[in-house]
Amino acid sequence: MLLSNNCNITHNEIYEVGSYGIGLQAGDKNSLTKGNVVVSNNLIHGYQKISKVLGAAIQTYGSGFLISNNEIYDGNHTGIHYSGIYHVIENNVIHDVCKESDDSGAIYAGRSWTSYGNIIRNNLIYNLGSNNHFPNGIYLDDALSGQIVYGNLLINIPSNGLFLGGGRDLKIYDNIVINAGKNAILYDARAREGLQKETFFSSHVKEDGDMWLDLKDCPWKSEAWQEAFPEYKDLIDDMSNIDSPYFFPNPASSVVNNNLIFDKKLSVGEIHKDVKKYSDIKNNIIKSPNALSQYFMDYKNGDYHLSDSKNNKNCQYVNLNNVGMY
C-alpha cells in the first residue's frame, strides 16, 4: 500500500501478482484535503493469484483520486475498490473479473454515509464472473450514499448491472445495461429495514452500529462539510424521527432516471417499495434485447458505439471514443 499525495501512477503493466495491483492511500477525508493522485493508462491483469477475494486491481483510500483510462481483466475479485470522497472513476475498461466471487462488483464501494462526492462515469464493464460465480457490475454496497453514477455501459453482468445497497442521495442516470442476469438495477432498503426489524444489516444501523460510529467520527455538521456537500444541511440523526426523508438510514432523495436497459423481462429491475416512496425512479427506457441492432453500430461483432439516430443529445450516454488506454 502506497501512502503518498500528489503522485501519478501511469503507463504501467502489472500482472501475475498475489493480491492488489495498485493500493493507495492519500488525502484526508475529514479535513476535505485532496490527495491529488492520478492512476491512469495502466494495464492490470492476472491479479489476486494468492489472495483470491481480498484486494482489487486498484484499491484506494482517502480523498481526491482520478482513476481513468485503465484496462483491468483476469481477476478473481473486484476491479476497482474505493473509499473516501472526491474520487473520479472514468473511462476505464473492466472485463473478465470477479471470476471467483459473488458478493462483489467490477467497481465497488460500501458502508458509509460519509463518502459523498464520488463520480463514476463513462466506464465500459462486461463479461464478469464465471460459470459458478455471479457478481455485479457497479456495486454501491451497504447504504453507501452520495454517489453519482452516469454514462456507463454494462454488458453481460451475471447478477445486477447496478446494485444500490440501500443508500441515499444517489444520482444514477444515463447508464446503459445490456443483458443483466438478475436485474439491470437492484435498489434495496437495507438500512431502513435494519432499524425496523432484525435483519442481516441491523447490527450496522442500531445505535452503536458502525454506520453511526463512522458518522460521529466525521465533521458532517461543520460549515466546511455542509458547503462541500449541501445535502448534509438537511440530514438528521434523530432516532425519534425515523420516517423523515432526511433521516440517514432512509433510501431518500435519490434519482434513478434516463437509464437505457435491454432486458428480456422488460423490467428496470428490483426496486424496494421504500425506495419508491422516498426517491424518484423515472423515465428509464426499457427495451427487448431484440432491439440492440437498432441502437448500436454492430453489436453482434462487439461494436457498441451508439448509432447516430439513437444517441440522444440530451443524455450523457457512454462515449466509447474516450474509453480505455491511450
For every predicted segment, state its role.
Residues 5-19, 33-48, 64-76, 86-99, ...:
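Right-handed parallel beta-helix
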Residues 59:
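Aromatic-lined ligand-binding clefts that engage carbohydrates, nucleic acids, or primary amines
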Residues 73-74, 103-105, 156, 237-242:
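Short Cys/His-rich Zn2+-coordinating modules
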Residues 110-112, 138-141, 159-167, 243-250:
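Short, contiguous acidic/charged loop-to-helix segments that flank catalytic cores in large enzymes
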Residues 130-147, 319, 323-326:
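Short, intrinsically disordered, low-complexity segments enriched in Ser/Thr and Pro
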Residues 1-2, 18-24, 48-56, 76-83, ...:
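Short glycine/acidic-rich loop motifs that flank beta-strands on beta-rich extracellular proteins
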Residues 187-326:
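Acidic, glycine- and Ser/Thr-rich low-complexity intrinsically disordered tracts
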Residues 26-28:
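Asp-box/WD-like beta-propeller blade repeats and closely related beta-sheet repeat scaffolds
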